[in-house]
UniProtKB/Swiss-Prot annotation:
Pfam families: Pribosyl_synth, Pribosyltran_N
Organism (species): Vibrio cholerae serotype O1 (strain ATCC 39315 / El Tor Inaba N16961)
The name this protein goes by in its record: Ribose-phosphate pyrophosphokinase
Catalytic activity: D-ribose 5-phosphate + ATP = 5-phospho-alpha-D-ribose 1-diphosphate + AMP + H(+)
Annotated residues for binding of D-ribose 5-phosphate: 196, 220, 224-228
Amino acid sequence: MPDMKLFAGNAIPELAQRIADRLYISLGDATVSRFSDGEVAVQINENVRGSDVFIIQSTCAPTNDNLMELVVMIDAMRRASAGRITAVIPYFGYARQDRRVRSARVPITAKVVADFLSNVGVDRVLTIDLHAEQIQGFFDVPVDNIFGTPVLLEDMKARNLEDPVVVSPDLGGVVRARATAKALGDIDIAIVDKRRPRANVSEVMNLIGDVEGRDCVIVDDMIDTGGTLCKAAEALKERGAKRVFAYATHAVFSGNAAKNIKNSVLDQVIVTDSITLSKEMAATGKVTQLTLSSMLAEAIRRISNEESISAMFN
């Protein structure tokens, strides 16, 4: 069996170290830096010939820098004769650009990134909760898209929620909400239906479901600016919700996210470490971060040993 080696870029070094600790191995020795003009510089400082190499790197902000680090690291490994290269991308950036809207003259950037990674020589991709599962089909190599839900569910169950109801923040998240509700004992769900009655009129947050006097659990795959999430929480509290918790795998937290969440009626926001939490977000006092290290370490072990990934969720 080829020697397994883990390497990390600069995007999520803490998560990479936690994964290495779980696997009882050290992170590989690589220097990922910048030339004076800003170009990415990579030097692999140990022998990887014939090794089963895993490169851990989310393509979160700064998205283009982190993507280029990953691409250049893959090329360096390929030229150093690595036996197999797996890109471990907990958060896959550009995933929201997965389609053309009608006849709009826009790119499908998720496909561009998939081609970029495939063409540079990656053999396999491991990611978590892709924004759109069909992105797996953009790649010409195998993609394992695993679920972060078990990590979030563990926290939900430990909170002793009172008469809980799972809430989808929009119509597109109903399938996720139903799956979460089933895992929590087939509890009720509610849906926040955001719509604009007519042009130049503020959006109205319509609520479908009973939340009065109950703990609400909003579930989503990611939180960006948090604007819609905070409005959904307000709508729930206005309808008598007791407490409102928000759960998401990916803590994108861009723009005014820190301000929005700090000033919101949300009781707690629970996310994972697929993206490193900024000091500004941590200072809000409302964000709890859970680690994906155990799940990712097990997935990496299974890939290296040619074992089933889907069996992790049976």
